[in-house]
């Protein structure tokens, strides 16, 4: 079992707060370069190469936010949604063994949240990343991923996958949750997050 500081290089994380995953005073390309070098040996070679800039430009296109043309912009000038999308890209850049998404769209407006979820889906599928997405949005939980686990009082209450998950509706999910827990908490609070 590895200590936490050694395990960290195998895990990519995106938190709920868009401000926590990036360095605001650095440029987009500098943030990406830091993410690219995560877990690698440090060298004295100069900053960002032309090839890296080209790679970053291509990677940013998947986000569909126009950031590929703003590589030298300070991250602090980006919107919360743009920063969160950049954080997602940074967290998945070195293809972690586990990508942990902790309510990564909760602080975003619906349109930007949809773009970030779309980018998430593309990145996860393209790179075949094992991903744990924590969300209180039942629609998102049903629509994304191949397995849905619901917790109640610190324990797994539901574990749904395969064809059963594909056919699931929000109403079905809430009913199953209520049956599994004996709780009447399966209401709008769960549905809306």
Explain the meaning of each model-derived region:
Residues 26-38:
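Q-loop/switch helix immediately C-terminal to the Walker
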Residues 114-127:
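Helical segment within the ABC ATPase nucleotide-binding domain
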Residues 155-179:
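Conserved beta-strand-loop-alpha-helix hinge in the C-terminal portion
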């Amino acid at each position: 079992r590895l200590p936490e500081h050694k395990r960290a290089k195998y895990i990519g994380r995106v938190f709920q707060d868009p401000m926590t995953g990036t360095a605001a005073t650095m440029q987009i390309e500098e943030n990406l370069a830091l993410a690219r070098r995560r877990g690698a040996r440090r060298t004295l070679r100069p900053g960002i190469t032309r090839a890296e800039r080209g790679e970053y430009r291509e990677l940013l296109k998947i986000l569909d936010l126009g950031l590929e043309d703003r590589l030298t912009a300070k991250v602090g000038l980006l919107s919360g949604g743009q920063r969160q999308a950049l954080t997602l890209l940074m967290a998945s850049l070195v293809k972690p063994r586990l990508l942990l998404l902790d309510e990564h769209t909760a602080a975003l407006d619906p349109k930007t949240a949809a773009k970030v979820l779309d980018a998430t889906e593309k990145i996860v599928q393209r790179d075949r990343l094992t991903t744990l997405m924590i969300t209180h949005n039942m629609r998102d939980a049903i629509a994304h991923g191949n397995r849905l686990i619901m917790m109640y009082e610190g324990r797994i209450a539901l574990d749904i996958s395969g064809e059963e998950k594909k056919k699931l509706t929000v109403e079905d999910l809430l009913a199953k949750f209520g049956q599994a827990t004996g709780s009447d908490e399966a209401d709008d609070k769960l549905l809306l997050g």
